[in-house]
């Protein structure tokens, strides 16, 4: 037995040609790893570029179907859908999120009916639906956790019933993953996958997304710091991850 040291160990042996390098590569990125966001706008036809996301557009549902076909033809097999609803449907509790056959649910059904092979990820959060732009129910200036979870659970069930393959709670309420998983199991959505935003930071990087779903104006100068994480805390992110049970 010899020790792993030069000259018995020559790591350059593994780099002598491109095929060998490919054979032992640790990280490979392909179109199978990509997820294309689709922003679908209610009562809208055509496309509308999102100024803070160059090259990304708000789409009417018919245009979204065309976009999904183009995405599949390009070799990307997964999409994440986000709703842009009419402002007059927004209220303080995001009630439109749990209405049967709401806009995003009907859009998901249309996409899955036409493209059953696409992996469709649906966002679970209330900020596209609330008139204050927060991800939960407000009591005064405070987002209340447990009452928000009740709505998120119903929203998740609605999206699963519409045909979403994966449910992605992005709200950062404590305990929502366990509650949603339990409800999905109870309602026989056992194969629906949960993709949790387990560690979501209160970051300016979310600004373009809020522009995309038209929630930025509703949020105004209000902060999401009471539920999204402080950007300075990495250990807290690990703690959040340890609390996820799905």
Protein language model features and the residues they cover:
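N-terminal amphipathic alpha-helix/helix-capping segment at the start of soluble metabolic enzymes
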Residues: 2-39, 44-46, 216, 224
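Short, well-ordered coil/turn segments that N-cap beta-strands
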Residues: 31-34, 75-77, 115-118, 163-165, ...
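Glycine-rich, proline-tolerant flexible connector loops at the mouths of alpha/beta enzymes
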Residues: 48-56, 77-102, 129, 169-177
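Conserved anion-binding
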Residues: 127-135, 173-230
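Conserved small/polar residues in nucleotide/adenosyl-binding loops
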Residues: 245-246
């Amino acid at each position: 037995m010899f020790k792993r040291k030069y000259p018995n160990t020559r790591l350059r042996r593994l780099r002598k040609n491109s095929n060998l390098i490919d054979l032992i590569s640790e990280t490979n990125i392909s179109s199978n790893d990509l997820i294309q966001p689709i922003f679908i706008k209610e009562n809208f036809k055509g496309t509308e570029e999102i100024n803070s996301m160059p090259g990304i557009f708000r789409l009417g549902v018919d245009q979204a179907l065309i976009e999904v076909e183009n995405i599949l033809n390009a070799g990307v097999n997964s999409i994440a859908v986000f709703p842009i609803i009419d402002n007059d449907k927004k209220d303080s509790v995001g009630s439109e999120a749990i209405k049967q056959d709401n806009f995003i649910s009907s859009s998901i059904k249309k996409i899955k009916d036409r493209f059953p092979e696409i992996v469709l990820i649906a966002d679970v959060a209330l900020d596209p639906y609330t008139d204050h732009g927060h991800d939960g129910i407000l009591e005064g200036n405070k987002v209340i956790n447990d009452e928000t979870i009740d709505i998120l659970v119903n929203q998740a069930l609605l999206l699963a019933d519409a045909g979403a393959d994966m449910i992605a709670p992005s709200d950062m309420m404590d305990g929502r993953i366990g509650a949603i998983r339990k409800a999905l199991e109870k309602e026989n959505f056992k194969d629906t996958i949960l993709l949790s935003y387990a560690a979501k930071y209160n970051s300016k990087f979310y600004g373009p997304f809020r522009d995309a779903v038209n929630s930025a104006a509703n949020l105004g100068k209000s902060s999401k710091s009471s539920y999204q994480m402080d950007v300075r805390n990495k250990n807290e992110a690990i703690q959040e991850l340890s609390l996820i049970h799905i």
